[in-house]
């Protein structure tokens, strides 16, 4: 395989990853997931196993440009070799599906279909999530002030 072919493939994976992240960020601030109306939570893991969450009970709480900030932060995380997880929880924070993205490769445990999985373009993994640790406000995420979490501003990858 020639060097040009390798570069082309890397660029294609990068572009697809960024488009996927932008789509997921848009979904995170829009409640159009179907009858059950789950809420979206994004969960980012860095080298120190520190987690960053956001949830969107009210899309209007995000400042202008919130979608782009979240997509930008997630893209930076991926480029740094970390994992981004987009998780959709119901209003009680219980049944969810989860998509894992690492190095531009999507990985999904194969557990069966769910309506919300269409937003992840694949089959979901089913999992229980504690509402206590998942639900911080969009305002706390943007400002990085949530108690109990070390957070970074969306426009600066601080790891």
From Swiss-Prot:
It comes from the Eukaryota. The lineage of its organism: Eukaryota, Fungi, Dikarya, Ascomycota, Taphrinomycotina. This is Uncharacterized protein C14C8.11c.
């Amino acid at each position: 395989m020639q060097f040009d072919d390798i570069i082309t493939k890397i660029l294609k994976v990068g572009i697809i990853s960024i488009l996927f992240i932008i789509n997921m960020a848009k979904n995170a601030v829009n409640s159009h997931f179907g009858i059950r109306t789950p809420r979206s939570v994004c969960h980012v893991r860095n080298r120190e196993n520190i987690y960053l969450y956001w949830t969107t009970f009210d899309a209007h709480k995000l400042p202008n440009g919130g979608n782009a900030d979240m997509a930008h932060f997630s893209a930076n995380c991926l480029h740094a070799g970390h994992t981004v997880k987009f998780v959709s929880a119901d209003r009680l924070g219980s049944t969810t599906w989860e998509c894992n993205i690492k190095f531009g490769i999507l990985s999904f445990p194969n557990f069966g279909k769910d309506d919300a999985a269409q937003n992840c373009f694949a089959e979901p993994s089913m999992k229980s999530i504690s509402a206590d640790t998942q639900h911080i406000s969009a305002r706390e995420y943007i400002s990085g002030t949530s108690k109990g979490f070390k957070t970074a501003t969306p426009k600066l990858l601080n790891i």
